[in-house]
From Swiss-Prot:
GO terms for molecular function: tRNA (guanine(46)-N7)-methyltransferase activity. It comes from Chlamydia trachomatis serovar A (strain ATCC VR-571B / DSM 19440 / HAR-13). InterPro entries: SAM-dependent_MTases_sf (IPR029063), tRNA_(Gua-N-7)_MeTrfase_Trmb (IPR003358), tRNA_methyltr_TrmB_bact (IPR055361). One of its GO terms (cellular component) is tRNA methyltransferase complex. The keyword Methyltransferase applies. This is tRNA (guanine-N(7)-)-methyltransferase. PROSITE patterns: SAM_MT_TRMB (PS51625).
Length: 219
C-alpha cells in the first residue's frame, strides 16, 4: 500500500476503502464527497472512531456486527497501512479508513447527523501547556462532533490521562448531556475492547478512564 500521490500533487481522493485527506491543502471544497450510501453500498448506521492507531479496536467492532458501518480516522500513514492490512486479513467490508486530520475531515466532509456514535480512543493528551492548542477536545471541534451526531447519538472518550479526561469533560458539558452520573466517568477494568494503546498503558500499570455524552433533542 502506497500513498496515491506525491506531496506536490496531493489532493483528496478515495482508493481501496481509504479516503486520503492531505494536510496543508487549500482546495478541499473542490472534492465531491460521495454519499455514505455510495461508500458503504448500504443504508446502515455509521459509527466513527478517532485516533484509530493500528486498528485493533475498530476492526474488532466492525467484525462484531456487519450491519453497522465504521469509519476509522488516523492521521499517520504507517498506522493507516496497518489498519488496511487488517481489513484485508479479516475480510472486513463495513469499514472506511480516513487518512488525515480528524478536524479537517469533519469540517469539510461530514454532513449533519451522520453518526450514531463517535469514539475517541486514547488521543494525544499534549500535556505541556504550550501544546494544549493541539488537543482534540476544544470547543470548536466538540461542536463539530456534536453537529455530526444524530439525536440520541453518543460521544465516547477513552484515555489514560486523568487531567485530559477532566478537561475534555468540562468542554463536553457545554454542548452535550452526560451519559454517566457525576463525576461523569468510570474506571474501565476490562471488556472495553483491545487496542495497542490500551494494552500499552495497562502494561505500565496505568488506569483507563471512559466518559460518555449524549446529543439530546434540541441540541
Amino acid at each position: 500500500m502506497k500513498l496515491p500521490y506525491f506531496w506536490e500533487e496531493r489532493s483528496p481522493q478515495i482508493a481501496n476503502h481509504v479516503f486520503y485527506v492531505p494536510n496543508y491543502y487549500s482546495r478541499y471544497e473542490e472534492f465531491v464527497m460521495p454519499t455514505w450510501q455510495e461508500l458503504f453500498a448500504n443504508n446502515g448506521p455509521i459509527c466513527c472512531e478517532l485516533c484509530s492507531g493500528n486498528g485493533d479496536w475498530v476492526v474488532e467492532q466492525a467484525l462484531k456486527d456487519a450491519s453497522v458501518n465504521w469509519i476509522a480516522v488516523e492521521k499517520r500513514f504507517d498506522r493507516v497501512r496497518k489498519i488496511w492490512s487488517k481489513m484485508g486479513n479479516y475480510r472486513v467490508n463495513n469499514l472506511l479508513i480516513v487518512c488525515g486530520e480528524a478536524q479537517t475531515f469533519f469540517s469539510h466532509y461530514v454532513s449533519d447527523a451522520s453518526f450514531q456514535k463517535i469514539v475517541v480512543n486514547f488521543p494525544d493528551p499534549w500535556p505541556k501547556f504550550r501544546h494544549r492548542k493541539h488537543r482534540l477536545f476544544q470547543d470548536l471541534f466538540v461542536q463539530d462532533m456534536m453537529r455530526t451526531l444524530v439525536v440520541g447519538g453518543q460521544l465516547t472518550l477513552a484515555t489514560d490521562d486523568y487531567n485530559y479526561l477532566v478537561n475534555a469533560i468540562t468542554v463536553m458539558l457545554k454542548y452535550l448531556s452526560p451519559g454517566l452520573k457525576s463525576p461523569h466517568y468510570i474506571n474501565v477494568k476490562d471488556n472495553y475492547g483491545g487496542s495497542w494503546f490500551e494494552n500499552l498503558w495497562r502494561s505500565k500499570g496505568q488506569e483507563i478512564f471512559c466518559t460518555e455524552f449524549i446529543k439530546r433533542v434540541g441540541i
